[in-house]
């Protein structure tokens, strides 16, 4: 019995080769899912690193701005994909569309809504691919378990056909079946961990972008209030002359 068991190839590749076609399909699917997980990890890690560093740099540069026009001049030196520049453009576009309106509070409210929608859209864009990670992390263990159950069923069928409980007959089939579960866990665990890492990074990135949006809204609010005060000064001066 021991010699027969030793002659059986129980390496990972050997177990795969001797596995049932259904179990093989399960293993291949799980391996592909793992490849997708790591591809998303490396691609999005580079994306997060570059985007976050760029946004931090732009935020520091915009901190010196004292008006929306000055912020726009600073943003002119940003890259074409600059999100900070897009937020500034949103505020300027709302000012252009609201020309002639004396309701400054309404302008601020509409600008805040536009900036909020832009930040939300960026968050959705940065979160692309996370759905795949969540799906892989959720279903991979069960897919692997399906392969295990199928493999064990085949092992029992083999026992019935050979009419023996010899370990050399039973062990290889069970090992092949358990390999499917192991591959399922190998696919699922990194997917869940990477998903949580990216979820935190997206939250942090959106918070930083929200700070930039608040800074843009602050500059616009200051400009509107200063313009309103400047427009009101001649009126107050005329009223004083009449009273005098």
Swiss-Prot record:
Its main location: membrane. It is found in: Cell inner membrane. It is a multi-pass membrane protein. GO terms for molecular function: transmembrane transporter activity. InterPro entries: ExbB/TolQ_transport, MotA_ExbB_proton_chnl, TonB_ExbB_1. GO terms for biological process: bacteriocin transport; protein import. The chain crosses the membrane at residues 21-41, 133-153, 178-198. GO terms for cellular component: plasma membrane. Keywords: Bacteriocin transport, Cell inner membrane, Cell membrane, Membrane, Protein transport, Transmembrane, Transmembrane helix, Transport. Residues 42-132, 199-244 are cytoplasmic. Residues 1-20, 154-177 are periplasmic. Involved in the TonB-dependent energy-dependent transport of various receptor-bound substrates. Protects ExbD from proteolytic degradation and functionally stabilizes TonB. The accessory proteins ExbB and ExbD seem to form a complex with TonB. Belongs to the ExbB/TolQ family. This is Biopolymer transport protein ExbB. The lineage of its organism: Bacteria, Pseudomonadati, Pseudomonadota, Gammaproteobacteria, Enterobacterales.
């Amino acid at each position: 019995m021991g010699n027969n068991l030793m002659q059986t190839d129980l390496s990972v590749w050997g177990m795969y080769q001797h596995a049932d076609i259904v179990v093989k399909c399960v293993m291949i699917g799980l391996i592909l899912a793992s490849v997708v997980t790591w591809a998303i990890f490396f691609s999005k890690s580079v994306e997060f690193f570059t985007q976050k560093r760029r946004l931090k740099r732009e935020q520091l540069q915009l901190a010196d701005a004292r008006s929306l026009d000055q912020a726009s001049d600073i943003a002119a030196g940003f890259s074409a994909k600059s999100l900070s520049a897009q937020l500034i453009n949103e505020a300027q576009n709302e000012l252009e569309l609201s020309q002639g309106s004396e309701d400054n509070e309404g302008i601020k409210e509409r600008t805040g809504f536009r900036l909020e929608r832009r930040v939300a859209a960026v968050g959705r864009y940065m979160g692309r691919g996370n759905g795949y990670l969540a799906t892989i992390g959720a279903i991979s263990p069960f897919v692997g378990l399906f392969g295990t159950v199928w493999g064990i069923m085949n092992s029992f069928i083999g026992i019935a056909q050979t009419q023996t409980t010899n370990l050399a007959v039973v062990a290889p089939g069970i090992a092949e079946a358990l390999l499917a579960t192991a591959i399922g866990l190998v696919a699922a665990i990194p997917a869940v961990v990477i998903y949580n890492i990216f979820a935190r990074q997206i939250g942090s990135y959106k918070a930083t972008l929200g700070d930039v949006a608040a800074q843009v809204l602050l500059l616009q609010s200051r400009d509107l209030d200063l313009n309103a005060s400047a427009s009101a000064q001649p009126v107050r001066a005329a009223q004083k002359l009449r009273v005098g």
